[in-house]
Amino acid sequence: MARVRQEALSSLLSARDVRDLADRLSIRPTKTLGQNFVVDANTVRRIVRVADLTPEDVVVEVGPGLGSLTLALLEAVDRVVAVEIDPVLAAELPATVAARGRPGTSFEVVLADAVQLAELPGPPPTALVANLPYNVAVPVLLTMLARFPSLRQGLVMVQSEVADRLVAPPGSRTYGVPSVKTAWYASAKRAGSVPPPVFWPVPRVDSGLVSFTRRPAPETTAGREEVFALVDAAFAQRRKTLRAALAGWAGSPAAAEEALRAAGVDPSVRGEQLGVADFARIAAHRPGGARAAGEPAGTP
C-alpha cells in the first residue's frame, strides 16, 4: 500500500472548499467534459492507498479538476504531472497545490486533451492514477498505455459498467473490445467501488476502481494496430461466428477460415470466446494484401 507521510500531510479539499473554488472560478461541472469532482477526502486517500505507490513513483493524473486527488497523491509521491483539458482549471491548479500541497514535492500541469497528448515534461511517468472523465475513459486509458510504455501500474476510477468491461474475462457478458485492448497492455482487476455521494455533482451511476499492472504484449509477428483492427472486426458482429465476422477483414469467409485454422482457432467460435493472445495469433495469419484501404500498418 502507498505510504502517506504523516509528518507533512497536504490540506485536502473539503466539499465546501470544492464548491467555494468552483464559485470563485465561475466553474460549473459539464457533461461535455465528463466532469464530476470528488469532494470526500477519505475517498481520495483511499484511492492513493489502493494505488500502491512509492515516493519514487512519477504519477500522471488525467483530469485533475480542482485538485482533490492531486493533493492526496502528493502526500504519497514526490512528483505528479496533471493533464487538464479545461484552461480555467489548469490555470488554477498550481496555486492550489502551492497553498495546500506537501512541501518539497514537484508538480506540473499540462493543458491538453489526453487523447491527443504526445509527451509529458520531466522524467517518464511510472504510474497513472486518475478519476477519468466518464465519457472518454476508455480511449484515455488506452492512449496513455500506448504512448507511455514507462507506465508500469495504475489505478483509475471510471463508471462502474466501464470498469466491468475493462476487466472482463473471455466468455463473460461484458467482455468486448475494451477488455481485449486493455489486456494487450496490462492485467487489470476491479479494486473497489465508489458511491455517487462522494462526487459533485452527484452522478446517477456508481463508479468503480480498476487497477492495472503492465505486462509484455502477446508474442506475434503482427503489429498492435493490426491486432486491434482484428479485434474491432470480430466484435463489430459479435453474435456471428468468426468465419463470418472476419470475412471483410480477411477478404472472404474462406480466407477468414484459413487464417483462423492456421492460428489454431475453431472458425465456428465467436470473438467473445477468445483471449488477447488468440487475437494476436490470428492477426499474424491475415492473408497478404487484405488490409483495408486507409488502414494503418501495424506498430509494435
Curated annotation (Swiss-Prot):
Q: Which domain of life is it from?
A: Bacteria
Species name for this entry?
Kineococcus radiotolerans (strain ATCC BAA-149 / DSM 14245 / SRS30216)
Question: What's its EC?
Answer: 2.1.1.182
Q: Which reaction does it catalyse?
A: adenosine(1518)/adenosine(1519) in 16S rRNA + 4 S-adenosyl-L-methionine = N(6)-dimethyladenosine(1518)/N(6)-dimethyladenosine(1519) in 16S rRNA + 4 S-adenosyl-L-homocysteine + 4 H(+)
UniProt-recorded name of the protein: Ribosomal RNA small subunit methyltransferase A
Q: Name one GO molecular function term.
A: RNA binding
Question: Where's it mainly located?
Answer: cytoplasm
- Any one cellular component term from GO for this entry? cytosol
